[in-house]
Amino acid sequence: MAANNSIEWRAVCEKFRLAQELSEIESKKDPENNPFRSKYKARDLLKEIHCSLKKIEIEEQGEAGDEADCESSQTADGEPEDGFEKTFTGDSAAGLRAARLAVLQYHLGVNHIETEELSAGELHLMVCMKLIDKCTTTRENVSLFIHVRNQLGILWAGRDEIEKAQGFLEIAETMYLVYMKEDGQPPLDLQDFFVPEGEELSQQEKIRRFEMAYTHTLYYLAQVYKNLQQYERAAQYCHSTLQRQLEYKQFAPLEWAINAATLSQYYITKTRYMEARHCLAAASVIANLAGEIPSEAAAKESEAESEKREELLQKRAEIARCWIKYCLNLLQDAKKLLEDNIGELDLDRQDELKRARRNEEEEKEKGRKSAILFGSSDTFDSICSLEEKVSSMLPLEFEEARSIFLVGQSYVTQAKEYFAMDGHVTDHIEILQDHSALFKVLAFFEEDLERRCKMHKRRVDMLEPICKDLNAQYYLLICRQLQFELAETYYEMMDLKLAVADKLDQPDVHTIKKFNHLCSSSMKYYQMFLDSTRSPEGKFPEKLEDDLLRPALVAKFRVARLHSKLISSNLATQMENLSLSLESYNFVVQYCEENPEAKNAVETELELSMEMVSLLPLKINRIRSTLASSK
């Protein structure tokens, strides 16, 4: 929109162009010791334009007399004199003058915020808003209306005034929706107010910029709702933002992909696996738009190529980790549905769920078609193709679980390529723990006890070397996690071997030796975990910390059980093992007596410990009597 095509007006437009160039381009080159040099120059130009506008306005209105001093047309905070006491239509001459002044106030506000002068920036933005609020909303000012409220929303969110930010942003959202319903024509962009006649933006570009402003509104609202702990609403707005960014091609591939992968993790917590899978498939496809990963040779020759290689490898590995979590949680949620009260597969429940699933599949597909789907014509097929490689339904039998496991395992391999032990210790171990968890939950679906035991052996093989090599002084928490998991894994293997042995009339020497090895290994790691809680003087804590209370007491309880399970034909050894077992059971009982608040944490273990404390002495005495009579 051009006021006229005079030389004076062209000079104003050129100043505005220079101000934009200084602010958006030249400012990136400013030295560290003067980081806002270009921003300040841009501000001066904007102030000069304000003076020129007042001068043009006076001339256009034919006001005689001495030319008013342009500085007197502003208050101390830069607010123009209030010459608008009634409502104007947005497309009237007065409305356009107000909008043009408001655009300057908007840019001055943003300029002050970018130079960390937040209060001054807020004042300019409020002046901008007051100017356009005097006018009816039309295509001439609707874009500015949304822009200024977006900025005020960001400003107040940065001050942790989340509700205030919410108010500005929700009004911006409503204004967009109302405008699109009642008018819908491409509105003027802020730049259109300061271009010579004939150089206005194209209709297509106006639409693109207007839609981008609204996309920003949705993005900021997603952050606001997240801060207000309205997580479902935040997810909806995040999903809409991502969808619009693709639709209008307003995205950086890696950033978009990471945001989509992050959103998938929210859907996983809500067991909405169809949406989670869609987000992850889209993330993987869009991440590939960032280009090929430069070779190691290219990375060595060029710093830019090295940085690109690092970023691409890292982001793709992060997306792979999100896929791992998807597969793992899908399997674990299925396990929760299918297990009985002792953690085994409930066959009746399995049949019931299979029947129910057949009836639900058709309804789910209908729901899927009404969901917001990502992708444009050139990416949608790729996204759908990737989705088809892994189910979004809870697996109900081994083969279904195995196919999900294999997908998860392939992403484990991909994630470990970047998050290697050398340089990414914590991340690498977390990935290994997820890999172990995948084997653990797959074993639940396996009916053959020997094969199930082999799956747990794979867990031991991947975790044990790490546990041995890791320095507990620097990685105490991780060491404890690994020790406890290894102890549990050997414990599960022991239970499986016990179940296999029970089917035999008389277990052979090899089976007994293997069984005792599993018991001893489990005890070793439980004891390492317990020892890690001791003081430097070797003293066990009188009172366990909350996060250690249940694990430590469970470890003691299981050590007690393991001692009692050791197989030996030597009566003296049997008595020694039972005495050690009794000692550990006694510890659990005594600790809970001295710390009553601990009882709720280990109700089942405490009940069994109390029972064994009364039974084991009888058994020990019988063995002692037998030994005495045999002498």
Swiss-Prot record:
Protein known as: KIF-binding protein
The organism of origin for this protein: Danio rerio (Zebrafish)
Keywords: Cytoplasm, Cytoskeleton, Developmental protein, Differentiation, Neurogenesis
Function: Activator of KIF1B plus-end-directed microtubule motor activity. Required for organization of axonal microtubules, and axonal outgrowth and maintenance during peripheral and central nervous system development.
Predominant location category: cytoplasm
A Gene Ontology cellular-component term: cytoskeleton
Tissue: At 30 hpf, primarily expressed in central and peripheral neurons.
Region of interest (Disordered), residue spans: 60-88
Stored PANTHER family: KIF-BINDING PROTEIN, KIF1-BINDING PROTEIN
One GO BP annotation of this record: central nervous system projection neuron axonogenesis
Compartments it resides in: Cytoplasm, Cytoskeleton
Residue spans of biased composition, Acidic residues class: 60-70
One Pfam family from the record: KBP_C
InterPro entries: KBP (IPR022083), TPR-like_helical_dom_sf (IPR011990)
